[in-house]
Amino acid sequence: YGAWHDIEVDDDVTTFVEYENGATGVFITTTGDGKGTNRFEVQMDGAKLVVEDDKLTVTEFDVKESEFTKTNTEVFGSIKTHNLEIEIEKTNPQHIGVINAWAGKILHGTPLIAEGAEGLKGVILSNAMHLSDFLGREVEIPFDEDLYYEELMKRVATSKKKENVTATFADTNGTYGGAKV
């Protein structure tokens, strides 16, 4: 906490996740880099998807990875692949897009980007990441919410109040993928 800034919240996170079906994932985020990189990568048995720099790259494998692993005899052998690049929408409104969709749902009945239950899943995952860090061990979802609250309150109790703080308001236009606030 406060790895890169004088704050008491996480500003540098790396999380490893494992799902019931055996799938794994890595989530990395930081505020300690000069220019962030948004990258989403999904590795599957027969292909890989990468979303980065306003494009989706689909790398299809000529042979499934699971089959290749069993049959390959070359040292450092690699699967033959072919790529398909797909341009994606240049405007990525991120947070402001979610807020605008929420307002549109209230005002005009237009669809949400995701229902509230999906947002709750994100909060649960974030809280699990924090609890794992608080305890210094892996945690499973669902986790003990009372334990999470107890651990969180320990941190609240030792929080350092900053003296002589001045409120600052910033123009955040352009920070959400070019979307206007």
Language-model segments: residues:
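Short arginine-rich
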Residues: 125-135
